[in-house]
Amino acid sequence: MKKIKLATLFLAFTTLLSACGGTSSAAQASDPTDHPSESAIMFTDMVDRKITLDEPATRVIALSAADCEIIYALGAEDVLVGRGEFCDWPAEVLELPAVASGRETNLEQILSLQPDVVLMADMDQSEEQVAQLENAGITVVVSDADDVDGVFQSITNTGAMLGKDSEAAALVSSMQNTFASIKENTNDSEKTVYFEVSPLQYGLWAAGADTFMNEIAEMMGLTNIFADVSGWCEVSEEQVIERAPDFIVTISMYFGDGPTPEEEILSRTGWNNIPAVQNNKILNLANNELSRPGPRLADGAKTLYDFISAS
């Protein structure tokens, strides 16, 4: 039970953090050369910092889980020399040295891995930490995707950084095609959905507006029952019961001990009149596909679409 509790709280914590801006946004990028060569790689990162690289990065530390996934999806995993402590997919990424981020960042550890680029989310470091990295000659690239288009931009920037422009374009195109197909095949609907990101045992939290889940729900013509609240929000059982969703999506993890997250939801007192519970329309997406701004966001959307369409 301790494992379940820790994993669930960790999931809720990291999910909440992904919606919060950090303090590195105003940090300045490493000064580009006054006269960059014709072969230099130049792009603007997600917080409008001008990035110039003489050549594609060959030693990268990716601090966010989404950035790790993007690098793997581009077939460039060999450039990774370290990962953020919360990077967990694909499984082989766990073999890389883990680097703490945020307040617990160990700059000496980062420097010891000798990266030429550190790729981080906007929340990962302070301006002072970014400045220290850049003063050590390390290029810092910031990703800050908060919607689907932002994910596309993050993939494009990472492709540029790695000399994988064509692979990045192909990945973005594939994701765009998935989302376009979902939109084209979606009929007008009055159905509603509730996204549960933390279970009852540890306090109910839901995805509201300005989240990937809400954006994807809108693609499918679904109404998020907590679209009136921005970001990730703590909610009550009474609110969920009153709003009576037609579908419930949970991202709670299960370790094989006790009822599954779906079974636990079905057994909650007073929830038996909720349409999603009455009709057993509960989907578990505990693999971060819908909560992580990476390539698998399209896979999560397709899984949700198939689930809704089969209902």
Task: List each language-model region with its residue ranges.
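Bacterial Sec-exported substrate-binding components of ABC uptake systems
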Residues: 2-7, 18-66, 165-194, 247, ...
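Hydrophobic core
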Residues: 11, 15-16
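Short helix-initiation/N-cap motifs at beta->coil->alpha
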Residues: 46-48, 97-108, 229-237
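A short, structured surface patch at a secondary-structure boundary
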Residues: 59-113, 117-123
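A ligand-binding cleft/hinge motif common to bilobed small-molecule-binding domains
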Residues: 124-135, 242, 247-266
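Structured C-terminal subdomain patch of bacterial secreted/periplasmic proteins
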Residues: 152-153, 160, 169, 173, ...
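Alpha-helical, coiled-coil/dimerization segments enriched in small aliphatic residues
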Residues: 86-89, 205-232
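Extracytoplasmic ligand-binding site segments that recognize negatively charged/polar headgroups
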Residues: 126-129, 144-157, 190-212, 256-259
